[in-house]
């Protein structure tokens, strides 16, 4: 991400993450210091009690950048869409 440049992204929430946050998606302007998925989660938690509750256990919330599953340490780069969702199970 360019230094001192804000980054506009769409954040989408799924399943119980969406229920706790209270919306399906939102477009936000990220501060320039938000560089990784983990940074973003920390920033979101400061936005209000609903976010703090949704990300209270960040190790179980999964993320995807532009529809690709990633780890918390992944850099956001030029990402346009970020999705948060609970672990996927199935058989």
Task: Go through each PLM region and give its residues.
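Ubiquitin-like/PB1-type beta-grasp interaction modules and other compact soluble beta-rich domains
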Residues: 1-90
């Amino acid at each position: 991400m360019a230094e001192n440049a804000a980054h506009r992204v769409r954040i989408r929430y799924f399943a119980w993450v969406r229920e706790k946050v209270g919306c399906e998606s939102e477009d936000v302007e990220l501060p320039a210091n938000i560089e990784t998925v983990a940074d973003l989660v920390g920033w979101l938690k400061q936005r209000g009690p609903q976010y703090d509750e949704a990300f209270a256990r960040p190790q179980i919330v999964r993320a995807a950048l532009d529809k690709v599953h990633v780890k918390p340490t992944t850099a956001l780069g030029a990402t346009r869409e970020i999705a948060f969702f609970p672990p996927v199970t199935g058989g």
